[in-house]
Swiss-Prot record:
Residues 4-77 form the ACT domain. Belongs to the UPF0237 family. This is UPF0237 protein SP_0238. Pfam families: ACT_6 (PF13740). SUPFAM superfamilies: ACT-like. Homodimer. Signal peptide: none annotated.
Length: 88
């Protein structure tokens, strides 16, 4: 399983640490990561994977709830969606 995680919110310390900790807690591996601050807003994109099958509804709910604790918006999408778009 491969997925794309995006994080957007007002910049503050601890966002990368918190999100990467949650990724590890959920049994996902960070394959690639990019983050920047645009004006005063933090943005991050990570490609994550797992050898095990993952329930995207569960992951989506977990990241949404966790994002609220950091005051950021966290989304997760299957990488298969993006791969399918390029195969049409």
């Amino acid at each position: 399983m491969k997925a794309i995680i995006t994080v957007v919110g007002k910049d503050k310390s601890g966002i990368v640490a918190g999100v990467s900790g949650k990724i590890a807690e959920l049994g996902l591996n960070i394959d690639d990561i990019s983050q920047t601050v645009l004006d005063e807003y933090f943005t991050m994109m990570a490609v994550v994977s797992s050898d095990e099958k993952q329930d995207f509804t569960y992951l989506r709910n977990e990241f949404e709830a966790f994002g609220q604790t950091l005051n950021v918006k966290i989304n997760i999408q299957s990488a298969a969606i993006f791969e399918a778009m390029y195969n049409i």
